[in-house]
């Protein structure tokens, strides 16, 4: 029964590759995919991990990491039809839970946000797609059918059938699960963005005030410079005016 179930799960993992990768032309090529190697080794390690067998699950995990560049903790729970495309750099933490028919691209991290024990990694529900280099952190939930854009940093729950992009990730679209059509959602409150915009406006205001002060200071200095430059001429003229009577008296013999 265990072997039969394992073969069914393996079949679904292979089906997921054919479903999601147009480059998968035949079974021989698919069997060379590092993502498939990683999930096969993980399922073996996880089965041993659940039986509380020490050391061996972790050893298998490290061998898988060495061979594929994909690091999956033996404790992570992963459903059927799981596909890691390309795979290099994928990290999945111990308490992560992944549903059925989930697809990850290279560089995805399902990580924690601290050193606390217990549930600390994401829960990814069925039919989720997580793009290249996305980082999903903490004990949050990515709802069924959600899409996470490449490079996004997700630290909050993503509702089902929504698309989240950006740093930090924001909901930008919602897909109808029946028709498959997406529609953009109204802008959500963005306190971080509003704070940054407020700081930007404040910096501009301060720059304008500094420019005004510099301009006023320049005018003030220019006025003083002109005043002091003119002062020697004024003093010389005053001295000449004051000495004129004395010179006249001297010429008339008053000083002899």
Predicted regions and their residues:
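Terminal amphipathic alpha-helical/low-complexity segments used for targeting or macromolecular assembly
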Residues: 1-63, 179-256
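Solvent-exposed, flexible loop/coil residues
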Residues: 34-35, 40-43, 76, 82, ...
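Structural signal for interior beta-strand "rungs" in well-ordered beta-sheet cores
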Residues: 65-172
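A structural signal for small-residue-enriched, beta-sheet-centric alpha/beta enzyme cores
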Residues: 170, 174-181
